[in-house]
Amino acid sequence: MGRELYIGVDVSKRWLDIAYYDGITVDWKHGHVRVDNKDSGFLQIGKWLDRIGADKTCVLFCMEYTGLYCQDLRQWLEREGIIYGMVSPRKMHRFEPDLGSDERALDRIKTDEMDSFRIAMYCEKHSRKIKSQPSRLPAQAYFKLKRLIAERRQYVACSALYKGQLHDCCAYDSDGSVKRKKEVMKSLKMHVRQTEEEMLRVISENDAIKRSFDLLCSITGVGIVVATETIILTENFTAITNPRRYACYVGIAPARKESGDSVRGGNHVSRKGFTQAKADLSVVSLHCINRDPNIKAYWLRKKAEGKHGGVILNAIKFKIVLRMFAVIRRQKPFVEIDSYRK
């Protein structure tokens, strides 16, 4: 059993800055290495670990979430059986390491090398939590769905751009320009349809995901986008099992803002949530106000009480979240209660 080392990785598109910290001192001279962010670079990481006398069973890696840039490194770490943890960039930004007199450079210098040392010190401070709850890549189906739903959003955004141009500028454009824009919009709609078809194929290949998808789509207003998005974010309701926790994650849970005698901000939703999921829930809520009798009655009742529209809409979003988690917990499709009241 070798000594325990805490290794921080600053991930970028081209390379990885890697530094280790032993919990006592920072080895400025030999404690850092830069490698390419590809397979050849990962082999260099293994050689570097051997050079500094680190046992792979005694090292703890830590890195920030950087999307696709850290995907290959995470796969390599899991193949090698190395424990690692992922940290939010917001947490790293607020992290204040306990620095000695010879480590003050970490406070003053902003480079990739210094960032890797800061991440290593964060890893040491939170090592117990990382070892008890190590990060793992989700199943390949979630990764495929995540990329497909991102592709669909790009097509929808481009289509909205051209639609706005046709509406606002068609009177000033030539006939050829209008024709080309309409052709592009037609092509984008076709790509959206093809992307959705591929999403459905990926969903149908996994029985557990397919079951959850069908249950979610039984809820009024919930379609392919919101159902798939919820399955991805919760990893099919295994990573997040509590509806209140999910509401907090997407930013629809009200939070208090108070300090002393002067600051009394009241309850407001946080801006730190996953805003895309929050926006998609807004679309579902507006649909439910028009189509769902219970939601419509709730909206009218609260409006009559003088409640602000945004507050009511946020409450409806939470009702939809509760419905999604309820159908998964009960493993039964959603049933509209009003249909049995006649």
Give the ranges of each region predicted by the language model.
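Short, glycine/acidic-enriched loop or turn micro-motifs at the edges of active sites
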Residues: 13, 67, 91, 232
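Low-complexity, acidic/Ser/Thr- and charged residue-rich accessory regions of DNA metabolism proteins
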Residues: 261-262, 299-342
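Nucleic-acid-processing active sites and adjacent nucleic-acid-binding tracks
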Residues: 25-56, 60
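Gly/Thr-rich phosphate-binding beta-strand-loop-beta motif of the actin/hexokinase/Hsp70
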Residues: 1-23, 119
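Acidic, metal-coordinating catalytic cores used for nucleic-acid/nucleotide bond scission
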Residues: 62-73
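Phosphate-backbone recognition surface of nucleic-acid-processing proteins
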Residues: 224, 230-305, 309
